[in-house]
From Swiss-Prot:
Entry's transmembrane regions: 13-33, 45-65, 73-93, 174-194
Any one GO cellular component localisation term in the record: membrane
Protein name, per record: Tetraspanin-31
Keywords: Glycoprotein, Membrane, Transmembrane, Transmembrane helix
Residue numbers on the Cytoplasmic membrane side: 1-12, 66-72, 195-210
Residues carrying sugar: N109, N117, N134
Organism of provenance: Mus musculus
Xref: InterPro entries: Tetraspanin/Peripherin, Tetraspanin_animals
Membrane topology, record value: Multi-pass membrane protein
Protein family membership: Belongs to the tetraspanin (TM4SF) family.
Length: 210
């Protein structure tokens, strides 16, 4: 039997919104992990992904309520807002995947230059590295004042910039891939909501149907 009835459409829409909730939690978790590194915190894209995740959670709750109650007005705004979320999330995901290592290095350089000495030392100890890149003007000063564990074991330590790039590149690829894949499911959500909204609830009074 083809899934085209009222109950089947409602269940499909509810299931899709549960998936949206899981995606929202996933986006927030992965973005928070990348932001928690302390290096990519200045990349506004990660903050944007967190905002998309939170907003997606709210939209999923609205979709669940609208699907459960067959609420015409709520489903209408659900379709409109979900379409806007698709546009925003698609753009953010493409931006995550489009950022190359040179751009990431520029952002890391700019962020490093405005960090306080205590924050730099904390990052150096956390990542067990010294300095940022050889091209930075603060390289010699960072190397001299470095308090990482590797400094006590060897005269040379790996530069923090390389480690930062490795982690930030991984975080951006995960964010971009997950966001891009699930942004297309939002189009499916709009279609399901539109179809379900125009279906007649067999439990309702026929004269009350729009």
């Amino acid at each position: 039997m083809v899934c085209g009835g009222f109950a089947c459409s409602r269940n499909a829409l509810c299931a899709l919104n549960v998936v949206y909730m899981l995606v929202g939690f996933l986006l927030i978790g992965v973005a928070a992990w990348g932001k928690g590194l302390g290096v990519v915190s200045s990349i506004h894209i990660i903050g944007g992904v967190i905002a998309v995740g939170v907003f997606l959670l709210l939209i999923a709750v609205a979709g669940l309520v609208g699907a459960a109650n067959h609420h015409q007005v709520l489903l209408f705004f659900y379709m409109i807002i979900l379409g806007l979320v698709f546009i925003f999330q698609f753009g953010i995901s493409c931006s995550c995947l489009a950022i190359n290592r040179n751009t990431q290095a520029d952002v890391i350089n700019a962020s490093w230059s405005v960090l306080s000495n205590s924050t730099r030392h904390e990052l150096e100890r956390s990542f067990d590295c010294c300095g940022l890149f050889n091209l930075t003007t603060l390289r010699l000063q960072d190397d001299t004042s470095c308090s990482a564990v590797c400094k006590t074991k060897s005269s040379t330590c790996q530069m923090c910039g390389e480690r930062f790039l490795k982690h930030s590149d991984k975080a951006l690829k995960i964010l971009g891939g997950v966001g891009l894949f699930f942004s297309f499911t939002e189009i499916l959500g709009v279609w399901l909501a539109m179809r379900f909204r125009n279906q007649k609830d067999p439990r309702a009074n026929p004269s009350a149907f729009l």
